[in-house]
């Protein structure tokens, strides 16, 4: 059985971050263990030094007072003071560093377990839905095959049966038809539910990813605070620990917590590689060219299924238009909505776009089969190269790979496109200051990019694009082969300025 989660980029990114976080937690525990040993040594040394100071004091009590004995008395007091310093240092390390660190680590461990359970729960829903779809499909295929055999029996025996036998067979055929329609609807609904469970899992991964990043920031802040407190206590030792403290202070003075946090963000950043999610498509008995069903029969059964998809496509398209209008209103009227409303609407837009893509892929597949049966030219659709099949025993399964940027970038793009939807064509607008200089800059496509909107450019790996404007939200505007449009900045690499000058002169 094919695993729908194995090759998911979301899953890989989340697991990489978990591994990174686990390494950071192990380091934090090792540092805390070292501090505990240091505290034990300080307390043990303080006790030993206190005993020596007491012995020296007793010896001085039985000694005649003199300049020498007075000097040794100061030495005894010095031992006591030093012992007190070591005692305070050991206790301070325990109370201000070790105890808070273990408390934070325990809370973080519970939080990680909760996040892992949440991810596992939603992942199981995806796998369960995937298996339910295949099970429902197999059941539908068997029922369709039996129904078709019964249908053929009725058709072939009409002339040789009595009216009573005909009624009996027709009643049986009617019940079979009702059962088949019920199983067909059940299969269709499970297929439609597949995208929502997948979205829930991806959103859970996204949220858990952000939560673990926050735990990493907290851990880095904790380690920095421990170092600062450690530095303050060491400073109290005075001249005897100056050399050691100087070395530590130099190292601590170089700490830039913002830089550390930025390093974590960069090291665990989501790569801008194209994310393609796999979704099962509906497969029907009527599509099997090797079935015993005749051509006209197959066409008559495929058309209602195609009409159902077209109705859903029309509804999803209207929903899309409504959501686009809402986003434009939010963008143009800042007092009308808050950031949460805009984000929620963008999420609904993303969900609707995914549903529309899946419906169109199913519709294209059935339309292609119907065109083949009616000997018409094959329809064209951008998803034609994204539909794949694999065979399992006597069944063939179809699935589509839909390009989907990662959630944060995806929602930013939706809001950005909605806010710019009412503006004039970028190609005909007045260039801003510096635009003439920028237009001579070039970039090279690192990955292929399939445009999903009319104002986007199709990119192939190695294409050289002229940059006209660098927009916010990770999208640039440029031209390729005379066509202007937007393209994702993460898919290209900007060439040196001399490359742009050379291209301009040419």
Curated annotation (Swiss-Prot):
CDD domains noted in UniProt: SH3_Nostrin (cd11823)
Domain of life according to the entry: Eukaryota
Occurrences of domain SH3 (ranges): 438-497
Keyword presence, Cytoplasm: yes
Keywords, in A-Z order: Cell membrane, Coiled coil, Cytoplasm, Cytoplasmic vesicle, Cytoskeleton, Endocytosis, Membrane, Nucleus, Phosphoprotein, SH3 domain
Coiled-coil stretches noted in the UniProt entry, renumbered to this chain: 160-222
Tissue expression notes: Expressed at highest levels in heart, kidney, placenta and lung, and at lowest levels in brain, thymus and spleen. Present in vascular endothelial cells and placenta. Over-expressed in placenta from women with pre-eclampsia (at protein level).
GO CC entries: cytoskeleton; endocytic vesicle membrane; nucleus; plasma membrane
GO terms assigned for molecular function: DNA binding
Residue ranges of domain REM-1 in the record: 292-372
Domain F-BAR: 1-260
PROSITE patterns: F_BAR (PS51741), REM_1 (PS51860), SH3 (PS50002)
Function description: Multivalent adapter protein which may decrease NOS3 activity by inducing its translocation away from the plasma membrane.
Domain description: The SH3 domain mediates interaction with NOS3, DNM2 and WASL.
Quaternary context: Homotrimer. Interacts with DAB2. Interacts with NOS3, DNM2, WASL and CAV1. Interacts (via SH3 domain) with DNM2; this interaction allows the recruitment of NOS3 to dynamin-positive structures.
Stated name of the protein: Nostrin
Gene: NOSTRIN
């Amino acid at each position: 059985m094919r695993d729908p989660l194995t090759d998911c980029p979301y899953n890989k990114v989340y697991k990489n971050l978990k591994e990174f976080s686990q390494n950071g937690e192990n380091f934090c525990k090792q540092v805390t263990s070292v501090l505990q040993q240091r505290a034990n040594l300080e307390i043990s040394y303080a006790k030993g030094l206190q005993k020596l100071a007491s012995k020296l004091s007793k010896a001085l009590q039985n000694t005649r007072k003199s300049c020498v004995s007075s000097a040794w008395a100061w030495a005894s007091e010095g031992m006591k003071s030093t012992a007190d310093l070591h005692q305070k240092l050991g206790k301070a390390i325990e109370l201000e560093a070790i105890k808070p660190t273990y408390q934070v680590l325990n809370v973080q461990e519970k939080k990680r377990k909760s996040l892992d359970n949440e991810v596992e729960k939603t992942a199981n829903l995806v796998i369960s839905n995937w298996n339910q779809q295949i099970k429902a499909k197999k059941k539908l295929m068997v029922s369709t095959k039996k129904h078709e055999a019964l249908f053929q029996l009725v058709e072939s025996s009409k002339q040789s049966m009595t009216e009573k036998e005909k009624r009996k067979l027709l009643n049986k055929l009617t019940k079979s038809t009702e059962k088949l329609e019920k199983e067909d609807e059940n299969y269709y609904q499970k297929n439609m539910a597949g995208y929502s469970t997948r979205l829930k899992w991806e959103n859970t991964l996204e949220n858990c990813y952000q939560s673990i990043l926050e735990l990493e920031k907290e851990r880095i802040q904790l380690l920095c605070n421990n170092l600062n407190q450690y530095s303050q206590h060491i400073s109290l030792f005075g001249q005897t620990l100056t050399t050691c403290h100087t070395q530590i202070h130099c190292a601590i003075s170089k700490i830039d917590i913002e830089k550390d946090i930025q390093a974590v963000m960069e090291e665990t950043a989501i790569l801008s590689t194209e994310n393609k999610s796999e979704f099962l498509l509906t497969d029907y008995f009527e599509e099997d060219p090797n079935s015993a069903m005749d051509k006209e029969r197959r066409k008559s059964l495929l058309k209602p299924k195609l009409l159902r998809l077209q109705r859903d496509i029309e509804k999803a398209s209207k929903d899309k238009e409504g959501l686009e209008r809402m986003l434009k209103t939010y963008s143009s009227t800042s007092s009308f909505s808050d950031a949460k409303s805009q984000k929620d609407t963008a999420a609904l837009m993303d969900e609707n776009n995914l549903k529309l893509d899946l419906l169109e892929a199913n519709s294209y597949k059935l339309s292609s089969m119907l065109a083949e049966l009616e000997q018409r030219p094959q329809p064209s659709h951008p998803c034609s190269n994204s539909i794949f099949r694999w065979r399992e025993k006597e069944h063939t399964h179809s699935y589509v790979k839909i390009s989907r940027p990662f959630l944060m970038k995806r929602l930013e793009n939706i809001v950005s496109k909605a806010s710019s939807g009412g503006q004039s064509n970028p190609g005909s607008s007045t260039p801003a200051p510096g635009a003439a200089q920028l237009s001579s800059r070039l970039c090279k496509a690192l990955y292929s990019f399939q445009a999903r909107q009319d104002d986007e450019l199709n990119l192939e790996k190695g294409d050289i694009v002229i940059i006209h404007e660098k927009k916010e939200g990770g999208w640039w505007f440029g031209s390729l082969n005379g066509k202007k449009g937007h393209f994702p900045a993460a898919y290209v690499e900007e060439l040196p300025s001399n490359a742009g000058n050379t291209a301009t002169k040419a």
